[in-house]
C-alpha cells in the first residue's frame, strides 16, 4: 500500500468506526434534506471532518473536494482528492449495510489512486493507476461474460433530478428484457466495485457527481473494465453519466442506451 492509499485507508477506517457506532443508534442521528430525496446527516458531516483533517495534516498542499463542504486548498494544486464521506446516506439511515466511504486522488487532472471502504463488511477496495485493483489485498478482475442475456447489470434511479426518469425507465425496461436482471443497491461507489469484482457485469447511471464515481471508476479500470459516458467517450467524470462494464459487454450496453438518448 503506497503512502497515499495508506493515509486514505487510515482516515476511512476511523470514519467507518464512527459510522458503525452511529448505526447502532440511528434514532440519535440528526438528518437534514438538501433537496427532494437528497439527505445529509451529522454522520456524513462528521465523516467528512475526519477525512479532511487527516488529508490536510498529511498533504497540506493538496486540494480536497468534498460532497458536503465543497473545496479546500488551492484551486491550482497539482494533487486533488475527491471524497464522498458517506455514499449511500439513505441506505445508512434505514439500517441498510450498503454504504461506503469513497476517496480518489487526481494528479494534474488524471485519476491515480482510489479507495472505497465499506464499514459494515470491512471491505477495502483499492487501486493505483497501472498497478491493478484489490479487494482486501486480493487482486480482482471484471467478469468475462459475453452474452448480454447472461449478464447482471447494476444501475441507479435518478431520484434527485427526476427530469430523466421517464427516459431512464424506458432504458431500464430494455435492459431488463435483454439481460439476466438488474439491481439497484443505492451506492454508486459500491456498484462500480461490484463491476470490478465481477458480481455485476456492467453498471450505468445518469447525473452523478464526481465524488460518487471517481474512486469506483478507477477501480473498475484497474480491474480490466472500461468506463465511458453514454456516448462511449471519456467525459463521464464531467457529465456524471457513466457506463462501466467488462470489455465484452460495454458495446452491447451502449447500443441499448443510445437507442433512447
From Swiss-Prot:
GO terms for molecular function: inositol monophosphate 1-phosphatase activity; metal ion binding; RNA binding. The keyword NADP does not apply. InterPro entries: IMPase (IPR033942), Inositol_monoP_metal-BS (IPR020583), Inositol_monophosphatase-like (IPR000760), Inositol_monophosphatase_CS (IPR020550), Inositol_monophosphatase_SuhB (IPR022337). Pfam families: Inositol_P. Mg(2+) binds at residues 67, 84, 86. Substrate binds at residues 67, 86-89, 183, 212. It catalyses: a myo-inositol phosphate + H2O = myo-inositol + phosphate. It is an enzyme of class 3 (hydrolase). The keyword Ribonucleoprotein does not apply. It is found in: Cytoplasm. Its cofactor is Mg(2+). Coiled coil: none annotated. Its EC number is 3.1.3.25. One of its GO terms (biological process) is transcription antitermination. Its main location: cytoplasm. Keywords: Chaperone, Cytoplasm, Hydrolase, Magnesium, Metal-binding, Ribosome biogenesis, RNA-binding, Transcription, Transcription antitermination, Transcription regulation. GO terms for cellular component: cytoplasm. Belongs to the inositol monophosphatase superfamily. Might be part of the processive rRNA transcription and antitermination complex (rrnTAC). The complex forms an RNA-chaperone ring around the RNA exit tunnel of RNA polymerase (RNAP). It supports rapid transcription and antitermination of rRNA operons, cotranscriptional rRNA folding, and annealing of distal rRNA regions to allow correct ribosome biogenesis. This subunit may play a central role in organizing the structure. Homodimer. The rRNA transcription and antitermination complex (rrnTAC) consists of RNA polymerase (RNAP), NusA, NusB, NusE (rpsJ), NusG, SubB, ribosomal protein S4, DNA and precursor rRNA; S4 is more flexible than other subunits. This is Putative Nus factor SuhB. The lineage of its organism: Bacteria, Pseudomonadati, Pseudomonadota, Betaproteobacteria, Neisseriales. The gene is suhB.
